[in-house]
From Swiss-Prot:
Pfam families: Pribosyltran. CDD domains: PRTases_typeI. It is an enzyme of class 2 (transferase). This is Xanthine-guanine phosphoribosyltransferase. Pathway: Purine metabolism; GMP biosynthesis via salvage pathway; GMP from guanine: step 1/1; Purine metabolism; XMP biosynthesis via salvage pathway; XMP from xanthine: step 1/1. It comes from Vibrio campbellii (strain ATCC BAA-1116). The gene is gpt. Its EC number is 2.4.2.-, 2.4.2.22. GO terms for molecular function: guanine phosphoribosyltransferase activity; hypoxanthine phosphoribosyltransferase activity; magnesium ion binding; xanthine phosphoribosyltransferase activity. GMP binds at residues 69, 92-96, 134-135. Belongs to the purine/pyrimidine phosphoribosyltransferase family. XGPT subfamily. GO terms for biological process: GMP salvage; IMP salvage; purine ribonucleoside salvage; XMP salvage. Its cofactor is Mg(2+). Mg(2+) binds at residue 89.
Length: 154
């Protein structure tokens, strides 16, 4: 993918707060199931914003940084998802979201970001991303010094 969308820590916090506001009132939720690993940070932020203490994980493996591969369910909570928010950082192709819908038909599936191929599978999200754009999450990056332009020419 040639295009990149970079999400800073501040932006992630803001996006998650916006997503949390859409989930009010918080009392309707039994808990949050964060999809590992991308949904862990958004799940923690949502848990804080909504005052939810019951947080668990759904562990589905389908990516090796930038390459999609076969989907494997490593860990999954019991039940049909009723009363739970399932939190993802991104819905891309929709493959993981389809699997989550199959596993937990009564859960509310939400994500911070959505691409067109998977957006219809979500109940809520806050950021539209073009299908041909790669997202760089803040936990995948570091801040580093960049040489000023005028020094490069010497």
């Amino acid at each position: 993918m040639s295009k990149k969308f970079i999400i800073t820590w501040d932006a992630m916090q803001s996006y998650c707060r916006e997503l949390a506001e859409k989930q009010m009132p918080a009392e309707q939720w039994k808990g949050i199931w964060a999809v590992s690993r991308g949904g862990l940070v958004p799940g923690a932020i949502l848990a804080r914003e909504l005052g939810i203490r019951h947080v668990d994980t759904i562990c589905i493996s389908s990516y090796d940084h930038d390459h999609q591969r076969d989907m494997t369910v490593v860990k999954a909570p019991e039940g049909d998802g009723e009363g739970f928010l399932i939190v993802e950082d991104l819905v891309d192709s929709g493959d993981t979201a389809r699997k989550l819908r199959e596993m937990y038909p009564k859960a509310k599936l939400i994500a911070v970001c959505a691409k067109p191929a998977g957006v219809e599978l979500l109940d809520d999200y806050v950021v539209d991303i073009a299908q041909d754009t790669w997202i760089e999450q803040p936990w995948d990056m570091s801040i580093q010094f960049v040489e000023p332009v005028n020094r490069k020419q010497k």
